[in-house]
Amino acid sequence: MEKEKRLTKKEIFSMFIRSNFLLGSFNFERVQAMGYCYVMIPAIKKLYGPGAKRNEALQRHLEWFNTHPWLTAPIFGVTAAMEEEMANNKGIDGKAISGMKIGLMGPIAGVGDPIFWGTIRPVLAALGASLALGGNIAGPLLFFFLLNAIRLSTKYYGLKYGYVKGMEILQDLAGNRIQKLTEGASILGLFVMGALVSKWTTINIPIVVSRIKDESGKVDVQTVQNVLDSIMPGALPLGLTLLVAWMLRKGVNPLLIICGIFVIGILGYWAGFLA
């Protein structure tokens, strides 16, 4: 009886290392396809000898593919598990593998983009920038090391998880489990960003409303900013943040928003209604 072909930790680790170069051959014809095939080579070499089956496997992973680059890891793992079953004649064929990839890349992208691009990266960048603004070199280092620690952990453990779970991973994507995870991460990110906006954003309107001289002869000057702070501290930074968020939702180019803020700030200081 022929011995079953099994992937070892060596092939899994090699796939993990290669996954860091997924976008090295990014192109607009097949997007991540060449990188995907490159990652799968250690598993394919282990499971298939030289010949038609190996060639078919390589061609299978040159098909169009695009999803979140960090969360390709569990898809790599599932693909490796299915290729292993196919190599051992367990009833899996090439169409099933391709179908699985197509079926997972959409939901995975829907999870990865809001969690990593929309939450983790901005929050870490904000924390690093807050330290950097104070002249602390730990700011950029904190951002770099924490972000890459999360990236590498996601790739490594995601790959192992996908390989161990195989097609059972589809059950984890079912229901509203992923939706709850995404919503929770988004709420956490908004909470942190809200706190940082209050700390960073400074808007001062120095227009004088009144001058009152007390009994000692001291003049108490009230400005628009003093009045606003007495009603609701941080109202202007909050309003600016909500305005920018609304403009982004309406599809306004972020570069135009940034330039607009610069122009208003410079003109406001020159005209004397901002300080």
From Swiss-Prot:
Localization of this protein: Cell membrane
Residues covered by the PTS EIID domain: 5-274
Pfam family of the protein (one): EIID-AGA
Main function: The phosphoenolpyruvate-dependent sugar phosphotransferase system (PTS), a major carbohydrate active -transport system, catalyzes the phosphorylation of incoming sugar substrates concomitant with their translocation across the cell membrane. This system is involved in fructose transport.
Assigned GO CC terms: plasma membrane
Top-level taxonomy: Bacteria, Bacillati, Bacillota, Bacilli, Bacillales
NCBIfam families named in the record: EIID-AGA, PRK11103.1
GO biological processes: phosphoenolpyruvate-dependent sugar phosphotransferase system
Predominant location: membrane
Membrane topology qualifier: Multi-pass membrane protein
Domain-level remarks: The EIID domain, with its homologous EIIC domain, forms the PTS system translocation channel and contains part of its specific substrate-binding site.
Protein name in UniProt: Fructose permease IID component
Keywords, comma-separated and alphabetical: Cell membrane, Membrane, Phosphotransferase system, Sugar transport, Transmembrane, Transmembrane helix, Transport
Gene field: levG
Domain of life: Bacteria
Residue ranges crossing the lipid bilayer per the database entry: 100-120, 127-147, 187-207, 227-247, 255-275
